[in-house]
Amino acid sequence: MATLLSVRRARWRDYLELTKPKVVVLMLITSLAGMFLATRAGVSWSVLLFGNLGIGLCAGGAAVVNHVVDRRIDALMARTHKRPLAQGRVEPLPALLFALALALLGMVLLLVFTNALTAWLTLASLLGYAVLYTGFLKRATPQNIVIGGLAGAAPPLLGWVAVSGHVSAEPLLLVLIIFAWTPPHFWALAIHRKEEYAKADIPMLPVTHGERYTKLHILLYTLILLAVSLLPYAIHMSGPLYLVCALALGLRFLQWAWVLYRSSRPHAAIGTFKYSIGYLFALFIALLLDHYLLLNL
């Protein structure tokens, strides 16, 4: 009985791992930010709960498809070789059915508790990541994460539209921030894992153009990100608190990118990658704090 329970528990964990829960949580933080930034009043509990649940389920479904398509690549890379599909703990067909179930349930929740526009935008994001990026761009071009990054940048727009019911300039600006953040975030990881990507024949920028070229582009995109992150203040979407935070966080990111560009230390790339995660989290927290501070003035 104990053995059977341990197998079932492991299988449950395997399916949870397929959804990339840590990535989904970061996406939902930006979705939540989009929801609260969209209104000067409170967000209804049904939209808050079921809207984010629907977005999260669809994101999880897209992640499962990514695992299925990349299972052979994952088996070749040290970072991913222990994933459930790469090790054969979960078969492709059950995984695809699981992905379909997640996506369908997520779409139903969005259609029932938010609005049709949110549901269709979420579906477009899902297909962009699971089909366009995973199925084609990842293996086709070193600009894969630049083009495919748009799908991953959608959550704040989805959260905003779930509350407002329409698309406006402000949520598109939030999308632009994540879009500019994506290349330095992923290219830093790609430098750290360059040999693994080369072994798996994935044309990441460090593999096709070299580390020096990639580091320069990380630096350039970080400069673009710093400029873009100041736009919410420029259009009076946010106030001085956000401006100070965006400058401090952005300049620190720029320092990481500069150190990476100038340094040959092996840990500089992974340090930049890790900072980029905290950067995005802190930037959206700053947006929220500033938003509600302005409302109370």
From Swiss-Prot:
Chief place of localization: membrane
PROSITE patterns in UniProt: UBIA
UniProt catalytic activity: heme b + (2E,6E)-farnesyl diphosphate + H2O = Fe(II)-heme o + diphosphate
Subcellular location: Cell inner membrane
EC number: 2.5.1.141
Matching Pfam families: UbiA
GO function term, MF aspect, one: protoheme IX farnesyltransferase activity
Transmembrane segments: 23-43, 45-65, 93-113, 117-137, 145-165, 171-191, 216-236, 241-261, 277-297
Biological processes annotated in GO: heme O biosynthetic process
CDD domains: PT_UbiA_Cox10 (cd13957)
Protein's membrane topology: Multi-pass membrane protein
The entry's keywords: Cell inner membrane, Cell membrane, Heme biosynthesis, Membrane, Transferase, Transmembrane, Transmembrane helix
Pathway assigned in UniProt: Porphyrin-containing compound metabolism; heme O biosynthesis; heme O from protoheme: step 1/1
Gene Ontology, cellular component aspect: plasma membrane
Keyword Membrane: yes
Further comment: Carbon 2 of the heme B porphyrin ring is defined according to the Fischer nomenclature.
Family: Belongs to the UbiA prenyltransferase family. Protoheme IX farnesyltransferase subfamily.
Entries under PANTHER family matching the protein: 4-HYDROXYBENZOATE SOLANESYLTRANSFERASE, PROTOHEME IX FARNESYLTRANSFERASE, MITOCHONDRIAL
Chain's role: Converts heme B (protoheme IX) to heme O by substitution of the vinyl group on carbon 2 of heme B porphyrin ring with a hydroxyethyl farnesyl side group.
Name assigned to this protein: Protoheme IX farnesyltransferase 1
